[in-house]
């Protein structure tokens, strides 16, 4: 199944090299970043799940970039809020 998925996923991304980068990034997110898979896991490895998500059009490089930016902004806002709370507590 993974071989067929790779061929279909290449068509969605454009070339094999970008596919490797996007799939690895997404697989890492699922494995270590606490991100939930967007397709049923079906006892597949993280890389296969990432390829299936790409094949179905659920994940692209642009989608990952937007999500990363949103998470970074949320993290920065939380840090600012925490620093503000600490500063107000010292007054």
Curated annotation (Swiss-Prot):
Keyword Transport carried by entry: no
Coiled coil: none
GO biological process assignments: DNA-templated transcription
Name by which UniProt lists this protein: DNA-directed RNA polymerase subunit omega
Summary of subunit composition and partner proteins: The RNAP catalytic core consists of 2 alpha, 1 beta, 1 beta' and 1 omega subunit. When a sigma factor is associated with the core the holoenzyme is formed, which can initiate transcription.
Annotated GO MF terms: DNA binding; DNA-directed RNA polymerase activity
Chain's role: Promotes RNA polymerase assembly. Latches the N- and C-terminal regions of the beta' subunit thereby facilitating its interaction with the beta and alpha subunits.
Gene Ontology annotations for the cellular component aspect, listed alphabetically: DNA-directed RNA polymerase complex
Keyword Transferase: yes
Entry EC number(s): 2.7.7.6
Alphabetized HAMAP family for the sequence: RNApol_bact_RpoZ (MF_00366)
Reaction catalyzed: RNA(n) + a ribonucleoside 5'-triphosphate = RNA(n+1) + diphosphate
Top-tier EC class: transferase
Keyword line: DNA-directed RNA polymerase, Nucleotidyltransferase, Transcription, Transferase
Family: Belongs to the RNA polymerase subunit omega family.
NCBIfam families found in the cross-reference section: rpoZ
Gene designation: rpoZ
Alphabetical list of InterPro entries matching this protein: DNA-dir_RNA_pol_omega, Pol_omega/Rpo6/RPB6, RPB6/omega-like_sf
